[in-house]
Amino acid sequence: MKTIIAAYSGVLRGTGSSLLSAVHDLPNIPWLSKSSVVRHLQIISVLQWVLSFLILGVACTAVLVYIFCTDLWLIAALYLTWMVLDWNTPYKGGRRSSWVRNWAVWRYFRDYFPIKLVKTHNLLPSRNYIFGYHPHGIMCLGAFCNFGTEATGVSKKFPGIKCHLATLAGNFRMPVLREYLMSGGICPVARDTIDYILSKNGTGNAVVIAVGGAAESLNCRPGKNTVTLKQRKGFVKVALQHGADLVPVYSFGENEAYKQVVFEEGSWGRWIQKKFQKYVGFAPCLFHGCSFFSSNSWGLVPYANPITTVVGEPITVPKIEQPTQKDVELYHAMYVTSLQRLFDKYKTKLGLHDSEMLEIV
């Protein structure tokens, strides 16, 4: 700032040398250095997604209602008509955009942490898959970056495979947010949607499901490797009904992105969270990251800890239209074993101690 003021003073005095000298010194100003600019772009890219995740749907709904009360009401009416006519599109595979998935903003998003995608086995385009993503974390940051964008090159690492990241169906009832999500290939985590993708959308599809859901997000915290899986068997039944192979996916570092106040079972805080989850579909978490300006103060920006998502070995699943409980239990046990093996194989390679264990609840 002193350099800029000095340059301006030089201009007022009529000395061009001061201006030229100031321009020459601009790269030496800390907040104008290339690395600083890039870092701030990374923070902005992450913050825009966090704010989109938290408030875009509600904000756009409020704006739409406001526009209805102005002279521009026709614009809101036309969009609402389009939204009604297009209501079922998210449930039929959505409307992905390669252009949006390849935005430069997602590469800045990736590099902030950074986020990496590790491929362990090839996937056949002639098969369909269900990816079980663990852990959920607060916002599934690794899942979004790896499977909702092309920032880590998922389509190049798994050629012929089209990933469909599944999220709460309620998000697709929100104006503008629904278009934003669909452009990334994101779909509702609804039975009708998954059935459509796995049976009427050809082959080479991979539905990515955060199996632990809201219950798992309530228990996530730095240093903990806990997944909610013991009673989560619906995704296995769906895989059997469609003959879709199961693929365990573990994201090391997902739980390090935010710090959360975890309420104990039986506490008033946990009671409120469970009631909210029951009636609304998701659980409110009391969490914080760092601020835009400093990693030492609280804010909504996640902590810049590495997130490495490892895609495990696919489990071949036969097509059984009416699987028995025994069938479901068998393939669920195989899935749990495969996930445990994946965690144990990569934990020391990705910074965890050999003594750290995966807790399955």
Swiss-Prot record:
- Is Transmembrane given among the entry's keywords? yes
What pathway, per the record?
A: Glycerolipid metabolism; triacylglycerol biosynthesis
- Does the keyword ATP-binding feature in the UniProt annotation? no
Q: Which residues lie on this side of the membrane: Lumenal?
A: 62-65
Q: Which GO terms describe its biological process?
A: diacylglycerol biosynthetic process; glycerol metabolic process; monoacylglycerol biosynthetic process; triglyceride biosynthetic process
Q: Which family does it belong to?
A: Belongs to the diacylglycerol acyltransferase family.
Q: Name one GO molecular function term.
A: retinol O-fatty-acyltransferase activity
Q: Which Pfam families match?
A: DAGAT
PANTHER family xrefs: DIACYLGLYCEROL O-ACYLTRANSFERASE, DIACYLGLYCEROL O-ACYLTRANSFERASE 2
> What parts of the sequence cross the membrane?
43-61, 66-85
Substrates-to-products reaction catalysed: an acyl-CoA + a 1,2-diacyl-sn-glycerol = a triacyl-sn-glycerol + CoA; all-trans-retinol + an acyl-CoA = an all-trans-retinyl ester + CoA; 2-(9Z-octadecenoyl)-glycerol + (9Z)-octadecenoyl-CoA = 1,2-di-(9Z-octadecenoyl)-sn-glycerol + CoA; 1,2-di-(9Z-octadecenoyl)-sn-glycerol + (9Z)-octadecenoyl-CoA = 1,2,3-tri-(9Z-octadecenoyl)-glycerol + CoA
Task: Provide the protein's localization.
Answer: Endoplasmic reticulum membrane; Lipid droplet; Cytoplasm, Perinuclear region
Q: What membrane topology does the UniProt entry give?
A: Multi-pass membrane protein
Positions in the Cytoplasmic compartment? 1-42, 86-361
Enumerate the UniProt keywords alphabetically. Acyltransferase, Cytoplasm, Endoplasmic reticulum, Glycerol metabolism, Lipid biosynthesis, Lipid droplet, Lipid metabolism, Membrane, Transferase, Transmembrane, Transmembrane helix
Q: Which organism is it from?
A: Xenopus tropicalis
Signal peptide feature range: none
Q: What role is this protein assigned?
A: Essential acyltransferase that catalyzes the terminal and only committed step in triacylglycerol synthesis by using diacylglycerol and fatty acyl CoA as substrates. Required for synthesis and storage of intracellular triglycerides. Probably plays a central role in cytosolic lipid accumulation.
UniProt-listed Enzyme Commission number(s): 2.3.1.20, 2.3.1.76
Cellular component GO terms held in the UniProt record = endoplasmic reticulum membrane; lipid droplet; perinuclear endoplasmic reticulum membrane
Name-wise, this protein is Diacylglycerol O-acyltransferase 2
UniProt gene name: dgat2
